[in-house]
Regions:
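Single conserved hydrophobic/aromatic residue that forms the stacking wall/gate
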Residues: 392-402
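FAD-binding beta-loop-beta segment adjacent to the flavin cofactor pocket
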Residues: 294-315, 320
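Predominantly flavin-linked oxidoreductase catalytic cores and closely associated redox partners
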Residues: 124-276
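N-terminal FAD cofactor-binding segment of flavoenzymes
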Residues: 40-86
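Short beta-strand to alpha-helix junction loop
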Residues: 100-119, 261-264
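Active-site-proximal substrate-binding core of FAD-dependent oxidoreductases
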Residues: 342-383
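Glycine-rich FAD pyrophosphate-binding loop
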Residues: 24-45
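N-terminal Rossmann-like FAD-binding beta1-loop-alpha1 element of flavoenzymes
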Residues: 5-30
Length: 402
């Protein structure tokens, strides 16, 4: 199979790429073909996250999203930040953490937003194939020329079942990787083409996420809570509790994977956090609806690899566009996808050979990452408490530890 563009990953970045490219197709009366591969059974199947969503990228990609009934139904009404001691929460004044000001943002289900984006993409002519993971990259003369989907009908022992189907080769003029954090194809091109040369080592965290139905008497639609401190006061961990619609709450706990204590269990720390009085009061008599975990990429600007490679692009969290100081990456991922869609169209239709890295550097993605560039390195080098004190006074540190 051959397409003009193949996109790997049906998250915010991949879908934004597909939509922007298809919009330009329509505007220019062209008929370039676009294929998007998603490993989940449907778009959004692997996206559990409740999310405080900054809508500026969506405003730019689909300005009339309100008229099209995008699932942004709960504007943020109130922000609360706490530093936790074991049995109490100390309120933190908003001016101490200005990046946590969520005025103008929305509490959403990111999975629902991606499903809606998938519908918009299909209406524009994008071919979306859920249930087809991209397992291998295809090369020709040291250039990526497409992907191979995974073989179907393989037993747990790696043997072919009678009804097996071999993977399909999908070739394209441009292959765009939006797999999310630590996507295996993204790791392959970063290593093969030395895209992280002269960059600081990348940093990762693990995030545990749950969706709860809580007591309507305790539910405050539009309330956003962020906490740090106990139960991991010596680690730059963080947590959140978002009051969404329909008496649902999205909760999460993030621990960086550079912790030194070999006996620490991130999952158990999450369970302890849920026992804190500020959190427990909401969850008592509630019902957990779903749960999951995922890796986060949080090295920021200093660790951002080159996003161009021969035959393709890296976008979103496959590259590392998350803004750690905000604990937000959906808006930057979506914007990187929009820019990738335009870059791909210019390259294929107009034969414009510009650097995608220069496109990123001229966008507000770079400005956001630049403003938060000190956040991760200072916490990594000096710890949670001293790091917080130095955050706005220290010059930009380099963080050479992975």
């Amino acid at each position: 199979m051959e397409y003009d563009v193949v996109i790997v990953g049906g998250g915010p970045s991949g879908l934004a790429t597909a939509i922007k490219f298809a919009q330009l197709n329509k505007e220019n009366n062209t008929n370039y073909s676009i294929c998007l591969l998603e490993k989940g059974s449907e778009i959004g199947a692997h996206i559990l996250s409740g999310n405080v969503f900054q809508p500026n990228a969506l405003d730019e990609l689909i300005p009339n999203w309100k008229e099209l009934n995008a699932p942004l139904n709960v504007p943020v009404k109130k922000d609360k930040i706490f530093y936790f001691l074991k049995n109490m929460g100390i309120p933190v004044p908003p001016f101490v953490m200005p990046a946590m000001n969520n005025h103008g943002n929305y509490i959403i289900s990111l999975g629902n937003l991606c499903r809606w984006l998938g519908e918009q993409a299909e209406q524009l002519g994008v071919e979306i194939f859920p249930g087809f993971p991209a397992s291998k990259l295809l090369y020709e003369n040291d250039k990526v020329i497409g992907v191979q989907t995974g073989d179907m009908g393989i037993s747990e022992n790696g043997e072919l079942k009678p009804a097996n189907e071999p993977g399909i080769n999908i070739k394209a003029k441009l292959t765009i990787l939006g797999e999310g954090c630590r996507g295996h194809l993204g790791k392959e091109v970063i290593n093969k083409y030395n895209l992280s040369e002269d960059k600081d080592p990348q940093h990762y965290g693990i995030g545990f996420k749950e969706v709860w139905k809580i007591d309507p008497k305790l539910h405050e639609e539009g309330l956003v809570i962020h906490t740090n401190g106990w139960p991991t006061p010596d680690i730059a961990a963080g947590s959140y509790f978002y009051h969404g619609e329909n008496n649902e709450a999205y909760i999460g706990f993030v621990i960086p994977l550079d912790y030194q204590n070999p006996h620490l269990s991130p999952f158990d720390e999450f369970q302890r956090w849920k026992q804190h009085p500020v959190i427990k009061k909401y969850l008592t008599n509630g019902e957990r609806l779903s749960y999951g975990a995922r890796a986060l990429i949080k090295g920021g600007l200093q660790s951002l690899p080159k996003m161009d490679f021969p035959g393709g692009l890296l976008i979103g969290c496959n590259a590392g566009t998350l803004v750690f100081s905000k604990i937000k990456g959906s808006h930057t991922a979506m914007k990187s996808g929009e820019l990738a869609g335009k870059h791909a169209f210019d390259k294929i239709h107009n034969n414009i050979e510009t650097s995608f890295d220069s496109v990123i550097k001229e966008s507000w993605i770079y400005n956001e990452l630049y403003k938060s560039r000190n956040f991760g390195p200072i916490f990594h080098k000096f710890g949670a408490l001293l790091g917080a004190c130095l955050l706005y006074t220290s010059p930009s540190p380099r963080d050479t530890n992975p």
